[in-house]
Regions:
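Bacterial N-terminal signal peptides that target proteins for export
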Residues: 1-7
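Conserved RecA-like P-loop NTPase ATPase core
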Residues: 10
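C-terminal motif of bacterial Sec signal peptides marking the signal peptidase cleavage site
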Residues: 13-16
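Copper-binding active sites and cupredoxin-like electron-transfer domains
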Residues: 18-366
Length: 366
């Protein structure tokens, strides 16, 4: 396989399929949303098979792996160390912002702190989170922490524009947890971008590892008459569970165009949280087998020696793996329709003693 072959082409070869032609969203990074709608055409809606003629680079609108000039720079997947102390002050603002969800595709999102997903939070089991939430948007929003054991009617209530709330909770259970807006209709608020990950470390540290976090989610697009050059949520596509993009960390295939560099035989710990709102993540690393998988908060009985693990909507799991030799290892949701729509990336195992020329393509930016 050459460096110019894309990850999706490689995955299709593994699956014995032929990549479908690119949809209008993301197919041309210079295209404007008002020039081409993201929907499938009427024949597809009627159930006709899609055109299977592969485009020139079989890239689903994304640059080949490591292609020079691939843009935009990726959202960092590196998990930052936990802040010291047992009391963590966290402040978030809910506001609406335009974000890029695929190459050249802008979306009018609802956000925590202006980005999708929201900031990654990290504490230790038994730590206290002192949380402040401020609504700077023009509609009601709220917060639901899956890691918290508190009364929803008291703390997860809707905040009107300009309102705020403060409360504390103790993170009693370790694991990889989702947080999200809980305002009805919840599916609309999640599909518009209001979610993030909260990592709760066990009291006894896990073995040292390179740690990465991936939040899977979906986008359902239609033209936005209110925000020039951006898409908005298609409510009926969302109800029909027909996403235009399925993504890790808010942007389709960003870690295919910008692989994440790791070392061969290095222990990797991947925190995978699935915001949904509709699609289960069938998380898999091509060319590797998970040594241990901690489902949700269960540290006592990890799965061992497994190939693919489902992460349900609203759930999260912790995966440990070693990539046994130098090379490129795609990670995907093994629901390949979702991988084709952007739930795909690459872990690039590079020997640290190899010459710099061995690192083809740009390094991970973080």
């Amino acid at each position: 396989m050459t460096r110019t072959m894309t990850v999706l082409a490689a995955l299709c070869m593994l699956a014995g399929c032929t990549p479908a032609a690119e949809r209008s969203t993301g197919a041309d990074s210079t295209a404007q949303p008002n020039a081409a709608a993201p929907r499938a055409d009427s024949a597809r809606r009627a159930g006709a098979p899609p055109d299977t003629t592969p485009p020139a680079d079989i890239s689903h609108g994304e640059a080949p792996v490591g292609a020079p000039g691939a843009s935009p720079a990726p959202v960092s997947a590196r998990l930052a160390p936990r802040e010291p102390g047992r009391l963590h002050h966290v402040r978030m603002e809910m506001r609406h912002a335009t974000v890029e969800i695929a190459s050249g595709v802008k979306y009018a999102a609802w956000t925590f702190d202006g980005k999708v997903p929201g900031p990654v939070l990290r504490v230790r089991q038994g730590d206290t989170v002192a949380f402040t939430l401020v609504n700077k948007a023009d509609i009601p929003h709220s917060m639901d922490f899956h890691a918290a054991e508190i009364a929803p009617d008291k703390y997860y209530r809707n905040l009107m524009p300009g309102d705020s709330i403060q409360y504390r909770f103790v993170a009693r259970v370790p694991g990889a947890f989702l947080y999200h807006c809980g305002t009805a209709p919840v599916a609309m608020h999640i599909a518009n971008g209001m979610y993030g990950a909260l990592i709760v470390d066990p009291p006894t540290p896990l073995p040292r590892a390179e740690e990465l976090v991936f939040v899977q989610s979906e986008f359902y697009l239609t033209r936005n008459r209110n925000t020039e050059g951006a898409y908005m949520l298609d409510w009926f596509e969302m109800l029909g569970q027909a996403p235009d993009h399925v993504v890790f960390n808010g942007r389709a295939a960003q870690y295919s165009t910008h692989p994440i560099d790791v070392e061969p035989n290095q222990l990797l710990r991947l925190y995978v949280v699935n915001a949904g709102p509709n699609r289960t993540s069938a998380f898999h690393v091509v060319g590797g087998i998970f040594e241990r998988v901690f489902l949700d908060g269960s540290m006592a009985n990890p799965l061992r020696g497994v190939q693919t693990v489902g992460v349900p909507m609203g759930g999260g799991s912790i995966f440990e793996i070693r990539l046994r030799e130098a090379g490129e290892y795609p990670f995907v949701s093994h629901a390949f329709a979702d991988a084709t729509k952007g739930a795909v990336g690459v872990l690039r195992a590079v020997d640290p003693n190899a010459p710099a020329t061995a690192r083809t393509g740009p390094p991970m930016q973080h």
